[in-house]
């Protein structure tokens, strides 16, 4: 159990041309209101979380099929050795720039986006957890290039009853781009929706992915962040 609070502002038609401006802030603490508790004889801090983000997206720049977007944010995820899902306290400051395009071929349902993201992460925790999850590092820089190709023919984006959604996401982090987070990651996701009877819809899905570590450009130590691994 825990307590989470926050708020946000969303302007879906900012400046009257379909542009989207968003701001959000969330903060929470898990497992009660005290600052720490005892787990198997070990005093463990309760995980705290804080997230702030600001983003802007223009889906049709100058009435063309091009998309432009940018975002900045700060993310803090608390943890301890007893919290397997977040073993380290991690703080991340990031910024990203995105360009997208609606394709004419094979059909109008296809589109692609390309994003450059820069981030700096700081880790704190026991030395054993630092060695296990981040190779003993306490601070890392990451530069990523992300390509997403997708086809979306769903009749409704939130509660679809017919159609399909396909996406192929490719991430290249570090390597020739620099930084300590050096890996490639590929994820393919398929979803399709079939009406059955009355208002019931059958959703079928298939997801597969692979992640592989890459060498650092300067020969220094590198690793795959545990948030980007498959567990």
Question: Model segments located where?
Answer:
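C-terminal outer-membrane beta-barrel translocator/porin domains of Gram-negative envelope proteins
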Residues: 1-3, 10, 129-231
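Gram-negative/organellar outer-membrane beta-barrel architecture
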Residues: 1-158, 165-166
């Amino acid at each position: 159990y825990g307590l989470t609070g926050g708020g946000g502002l969303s302007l879906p038609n900012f400046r009257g041309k379909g542009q989207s401006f968003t701001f959000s802030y969330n903060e929470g603490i898990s497992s009660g209101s005290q600052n720490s508790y005892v787990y198997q004889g070990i005093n463990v801090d309760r995980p705290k979380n804080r997230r702030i983000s600001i983003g802007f997206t223009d889906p049709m720049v100058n009435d063309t099929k091009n998309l432009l977007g940018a975002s900045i944010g700060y993310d803090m995820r608390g943890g301890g050795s007893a919290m397997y899902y977040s073993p380290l306290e991690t703080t991340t400051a990031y910024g990203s720039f995105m360009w997208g395009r609606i394709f004419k071929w094979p059909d109008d349902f296809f589109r692609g986006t390309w994003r450059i993201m820069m981030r700096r992460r700081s880790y704190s925790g026991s030395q054993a957890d630092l060695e296990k999850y981040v190779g003993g590092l306490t601070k890392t820089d990451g530069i990523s290039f992300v390509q997403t190709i997708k086809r979306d023919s769903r009749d409704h984006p939130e509660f679809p009853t017919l159609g399909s959604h396909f996406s192929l996401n490719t991430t290249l982090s570090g390597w020739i781009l620099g930084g300590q987070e050096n890996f490639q990651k590929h994820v393919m996701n398929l979803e399709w929706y079939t009406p059955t009877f009355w208002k019931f819809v059958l959703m079928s899905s298939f997801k597969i992915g692979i992640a592989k570590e890459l060498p650092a450009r300067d020969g220094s130590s590198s690793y795959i962040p545990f948030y980007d691994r498959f567990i």
